[in-house]
Swiss-Prot record:
It comes from the Bacteria. Homodimer. Pathway: Antibiotic biosynthesis. It comes from Streptomyces rugosporus. The lineage of its organism: Bacteria, Bacillati, Actinomycetota, Actinomycetes, Kitasatosporales. Belongs to the PheA/TfdB FAD monooxygenase family. This is Dialkyldecalin synthase. Disruption phenotype: Cells lacking this gene lose the ability to produce pyrroindomycins. Binds 1 FAD per subunit. The FAD cofactor does not cycle between oxidized and reduced forms and therefore does not have a typical redox role in the reaction; it plays a structural role essential for PyrE3 catalysis, to maintain the requisite geometry of the protein and position the 1,3-diene and dienophile groups through specific interactions with the substrate. It is an enzyme of class 5 (isomerase).
């Protein structure tokens, strides 16, 4: 049986998973139908959870010069204040998703991953001890496992027979990148705004280019594959925002606020991640953030399974943990789209929620939820060890488990999958010792009992 893991789809989620597997030393091949990252990028930012996960693996350093941090967030386009939230958490980062894809591909290749572009998958088959994938030119690629990161219309999910229930709400719109002249009327509408008939967002994405996104409810939606004309976008902007959109159109497209989730993330040796597992309206970067979390959660578990040291049911915990997270993300974005309806319908409700968002506890709750930092990962706190200064996330760069002793006086734990680190106590962490999984999730913390049980549950017997 081959020990290769096959990843269908070389977008950010598939490439992040490839990086995780490559870091663990697993033979990995990515099959991607496009010959290069798609331009222009549909997404222009990553949220706090992606920043933290990239920092855990040393990836953010390669992206720092490609974008900039911004301390803004929103819930259904109701402004929030991330800078008022206590704790050492990351902020969002503006960077085109195509550039994220390029950086991840560079890293994956440096870790020995084979990234095969212009390679389309046409069929998938499970065997008793592996998987077989047939490509467009008739080649059969064999592996131990297949992970479908091939988007909302996933062929892998379809051929694995995994249902994909959900809703197609009556909310849809247009978006386009438009080159405009200085002083163009549309520049007076910079930002995301709700209007009587819907929403219109205008965001600069270059020296003379803006991205324009419109959204309307209760209006018949043309077929998703129907070509968008500039006149259609101009008419929508005028109808909703009451402003003329003049300029030279570049990329134009249409979108819908579809929300769907796979019934299960695993079918034998086939697994799903990213949009193949859950499709949601990409508000505040939640869609990509949820997908990157899938990749980091799955990577070490799949590596442990392929390498033979995984405890029983470790791989099954991927569905248990990430399906619940995906359901929550879908619910969050559905709730937001509900209160993004026209002001004529929900104006009073939005006014009340805007007032509530001014309360510190409500602001903090919403910032953490939309940023994906409300879970069980630690912040990147500076640490001092006998070897010198480090931080929580630097300890995780190797992709191993970490037992961090912050004054608990634990005996040095010797486990082949866990690194023991003794650091000076810090009041920035509410624990005297923590056991971190390779994905940064806290598996145990002192003074609770159960360290040995947690080690065996997540990393197997020490010998």
């Amino acid at each position: 049986m081959s020990d290769t893991v096959i990843i269908a789809g070389g977008g950010p989620v598939g490439l992040m998973l490839a990086c995780e597997l490559g870091l663990a030393g697993v033979d990995t091949v990515v099959l991607e139908r496009h010959d290069a990252p798609r331009e222009p990028s549909r997404g222009g930012a990553i949220n706090a959870t992606v920043v933290e996960l990239f920092t855990q693996r040393g990836i953010m350093e390669s992206l720092r010069d490609d974008g900039f941090e911004f301390r803004m967030a929103h819930f259904a386009h109701i402004p929030l204040a991330p800078e008022r939230v206590p704790g050492d958490r990351a902020f969002s980062f503006a960077v085109p998703h195509a550039q994220v894809e390029r950086r991840l591909e560079e890293r994956a290749r440096s870790l020995g991953v084979r990234v095969r572009r212009s390679t389309e998958i046409t069929s998938v088959r499970q065997t008793p001890d592996g998987v077989q994938v047939t490509t467009g030119d008739g080649e059969v690629v064999e592996g131990a496992y297949l992970v479908g990161c091939d988007g909302s219309a996933s062929l892998v999910r379809e051929q694995a027979g995994i249902p994909f229930p959900g809703v197609d709400p009556d909310f849809h719109g247009l978006w386009g990148d438009i080159k405009v002249e200085p002083g163009a009327p549309v520049l007076e509408r910079i930002g995301a705004r709700q209007y009587e008939l819907g929403l219109c967002m205008v965001a600069p994405i270059g020296p003379d280019t803006v991205r324009v996104i419109t959204g309307e409810f209760d209006v018949p939606s043309p077929p998703a594959d129907q070509e968008v004309g500039f006149d259609e976008l101009r008419a929508a902007v005028a109808r909703i925002a009451g402003v003329e959109l003049d300029g030279v159109p570049g990329w134009l497209s249409r979108w819908t606020a579809t929300s769907r989730q796979a019934e299960r993330y695993r079918e034998g040796r086939i697994l799903l991640a990213g949009d193949a597992a859950h499709t949601l309206f990409p508000l505040g970067g939640q869609a990509l953030g949820t997908g990157i979390e899938d990749a980091v959660n799955l990577g070490w578990k799949l590596a442990a399974t392929v390498q033979g040291w995984a405890p029983p049911s470790l791989l099954d915990s991927y569905h248990e943990e990430r399906h619940a997270a995906g359901a929550r993300a879908c619910a969050s974005t559905r709730a937001q789209t509900t209160i993004m309806r026209s002001l004529a319908r929900v104006g009073e409700l939005r006014a009340l929620l805007t007032e509530l968002a001014g309360l510190e506890e409500v602001n903090a709750y919403l910032v953490r939820m939309v940023g994906g930092i409300d879970g069980s990962r630690l912040p990147d706190v500076p640490l001092v060890t006998a070897e010198g200064e480090t931080s929580v996330y630097r300890l995780l760069e190797a992709g191993r488990g970490v037992l961090l002793d912050l004054g608990a006086g634990l005996p040095a734990v010797r486990h082949p999958q866990v690194t023991y680190v003794r650091a000076e106590p810090t009041n920035r962490l509410d624990a005297t010792a923590v056991l971190l999984r390779p994905d940064g999730v806290v598996a145990w913390r002192a003074p609770q009992d159960g360290l040995e049980a947690a080690l065996e549950t997540w990393f197997g017997p020490a010998a």
